[in-house]
Amino acid sequence: MKIALDVMGGDHAPAAMIEGAMLALEDSGIDVGKLFLVGDETTVEKELTHLSYANSKIEIVHSEQVVEMHESAVKSVRQKKKSSISVAVDLVKSGDCQAIVSAGNTGAAVAASTIKLRNIPGVERAGIASPLPNENGPCNIVDAGANVDSKPSHLLGYAIMGSVYARHVQGKKNPIVGLMSVGEEDSKGTDLTREVFGLLKESGLNFIGNVEGHDLFETPVDVVVCDGFVGNVVLKSCEATAKAMFKWLKEDIKATPIRQMGALIAKEAFKATKERGNYETYGGSPLLGVNGICIIGHGSSSPRAVKNAIRVASEAVRHHVNPHIEEEMARSASLLG
């Protein structure tokens, strides 16, 4: 299996990306035949020398440009054809690689993948599936930011693709699907969610109805469907809340010696709780619906997060997620219109 890694994308690139690649290759549980490190060749070689690392499974692919985080997605893809993200996607398009991993500009990764790879037959819009911790295992929010404006058929597509991913990659036998709304009743929500509710009822998916924000963590649900605007706000709000809670907890623990002693006793419990919600554990989010596997990592990805993003890419390829998506989209063609 060959995977392209955009080593120039991310807040801590290229060091974190290259270290993550090393960790992935050293992990026997991750199936990677070769990793293509896409970036400035001199910079990559310098970093590998600094880390005193050499591996026959690594190949450097030179790219002359970098898409910065603030740049316009579509514009950057069209004007920076030799950027690391574009070159990495080209490797998938040509068949030299089966997947791409990037922690760079999310919009650029989405634009490059959809423009160059095109969508799987039957897929109108690709969607990002971002995992959140849930009592039933990972709960995938689809779409988490690829498209801020969506039609009912797009959300139905997200539900189908999310279910395929949960079943074949995450091992959920009969994935539970919920529709993000402001109340459980089917009459609640916007015109969009009410129409999508009807489509999901007819879809044959394991649809449990509307879910609210608190259901993301409390209710057994594997796929939560929403448009990219809502999904991205939910995802970032959850991340910010978790970060703030642990910050406040640390401050309050330091307030008295007794609390500090208690914290030492409960240290392992705090560590386990933090790990459940740590984005590094999940690695990255798949862009479902494009003709190739694209995994989008957190902008501040650490080496461990990069390693796990490579693992996610490997598993998506190994479980043939895209052929399964094409099959299910064809089966639901009448509903998708």
What residue ranges belong to the model's regions?
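Glycine-rich phosphate/diphosphate-binding loop of Rossmann-like nucleotide-binding domains
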Residues: 13-16, 28-36, 42-45, 51, ...
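Short beta-strand segments
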Residues: 6, 37-39, 59-61, 102-104, ...
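Short glycine/serine/threonine-rich phosphate/pyrophosphate-binding segments
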Residues: 13-17, 82-95, 99-113, 120, ...
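N-terminal charge/polar-biased segments
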Residues: 1-5, 11-15, 30-32, 46, ...
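Glycine-rich phosphate-binding loop
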Residues: 91-110, 188, 193-199, 203-274
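Glycine-rich phosphate/nucleotide-binding loop
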Residues: 114-127, 131-141, 223-224, 228-337
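Phosphate/nucleotide-donor binding subsite
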Residues: 53-97
